[in-house]
Amino acid sequence: MTAAGVRATARIGARGDGRGGTSLPVLEGEGPLALRRTRASGSEARVMLVGAMSGPLGGDHFTVEATVAAGARLHVGSAAATIALPGQAKGEARYDVLLDVAAGGELRWLPEQLISAGGSELYVSTRIDLEPGARLVFREEQVLGRVGEEPGRLTSRLTLRIGGRAVLDQELACGPGAPGGWDGPAVLGGHRALGQLVVVRPEFEREPVRARLLGESAALTPLGGAAALVTALAPDALLLRRVLDEALSSLG
């Protein structure tokens, strides 16, 4: 820990074990980012991200990296929601997620929600790099404020590249200090939970998904090549999860 806040990195590396399963030659966490391997499901290795401390707080910088080799299947979840909080250190906290999946590898990235507590300032950056033939389910859920409080400032950027080609690059800022209109009808429309689901499957190249609405506040959009994006808004985290789960089920 420094005067500027806590610096912590967690790394996961998955590869085929030669017996039809997945091994984890790299499983390293530090400080507030603890990693625990849980019971596997078939050929899939499962890892839980456990927050060993509060945060991220102001000035903290957390990084989580996951690399999935050809033939490996990895499922990553978290034990509880992540709560961005104000801290003694001044300035914005940062949370970086770096995901790489090789051709023939599969990653299911399904953490719990990120909650932007009142007074916090957090920048979240997620960069996903896939080789053609990789498979991905990526879920991101954000809740603006705890019950009965105003949100902090939350800026989130998500980029997806397949075979080195940019397929998705979007950024959204919410809360105090964000560009005007973030809570208006063109963006959140008064909702306090927002989420997205990115699904990449090689079969989408042959049979692309069809753009359609999923209820009143969610939409499915085909992206370039083998990818599809679901974006959703909801009044709370419970309803948001329900919408995203139903969307994933509809994709088969």
Curated annotation (Swiss-Prot):
Transmembrane segments: none annotated. Its main location: cytoplasm. One of its GO terms (cellular component) is cytoplasm. Required for maturation of urease via the functional incorporation of the urease nickel metallocenter. UreD, UreF and UreG form a complex that acts as a GTP-hydrolysis-dependent molecular chaperone, activating the urease apoprotein by helping to assemble the nickel containing metallocenter of UreC. The UreE protein probably delivers the nickel. InterPro entries: UreD. It is found in: Cytoplasm. The gene is ureD. The lineage of its organism: Bacteria, Bacillati, Actinomycetota, Actinomycetes, Kitasatosporales. One of its GO terms (molecular function) is nickel cation binding. Keywords: Chaperone, Cytoplasm, Nickel insertion. This is Urease accessory protein UreD.
